[in-house]
């Protein structure tokens, strides 16, 4: 029960950051920046949801059991092995999505009013969102480790810091990189 508030706040970080980015995006391309950020974030969220969150959710009960048993060595080894396995999956996926951001967006969205310019700005956002995959993976595994140890304070602090970093980076990058800067702010704040 004591973990409820920190867990709730931690799960709100990504939607809060997206809302912040969307607010900044509303000033770009006569409002089309909002669509670019949201469409790119949808693709990004599906990919990290399938891979990162699946791994994090599978590992949590095991970490909880090890924490209850006070098996510190296995706990640490499991976290290390999970981070290594995730890196093995996430780094190539990150690079692949960066390289293929334009074709992915074009295949999925380009039709009707979603023209080549929309593909260009949305793929730019997806390119930079992709950089956040490794950080998102690490953050999710380490948060689960803290929760398994009944420590909600660190993920809560991490979430609050993430939101602050995202705001600062949005302010600094939106003028220089438009939707790419907003997506990069989100990626770096993971």
Model-derived features: where do they sit?
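Membrane-embedded alpha-helical bundles of multi-pass transporters/translocases
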Residues: 1-190
């Amino acid at each position: 029960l004591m973990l409820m508030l920190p867990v709730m706040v931690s799960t709100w970080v990504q939607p809060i950051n997206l809302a912040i980015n969307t607010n900044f995006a509303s000033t770009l391309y006569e409002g089309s920046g909002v669509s670019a950020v949201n469409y790119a974030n949808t693709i990004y969220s599906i990919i990290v949801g399938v891979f990162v969150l699946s791994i994090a959710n599978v590992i949590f009960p095991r970490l909880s059991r090890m924490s209850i048993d006070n098996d510190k060595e296995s706990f640490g080894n499991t976290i290390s092995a999970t981070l290594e396995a995730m890196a093995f999956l996430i780094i190539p996926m990150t690079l692949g999505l960066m390289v293929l951001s334009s074709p992915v967006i074009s295949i999925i969205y380009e039709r009707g009013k979603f023209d080549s310019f929309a593909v260009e700005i949305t793929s730019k956002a997806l390119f930079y969102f992709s950089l956040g995959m490794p950080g998102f993976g690490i953050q999710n595994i380490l948060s689960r480790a803290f929760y398994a140890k009944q420590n909600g304070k660190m993920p809560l602090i991490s979430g609050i810091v993430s939101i602050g970093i995202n705001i600062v980076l949005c302010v600094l990058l939106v003028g220089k990189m438009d939707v790419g800067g907003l997506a990069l702010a989100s990626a770096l704040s993971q």
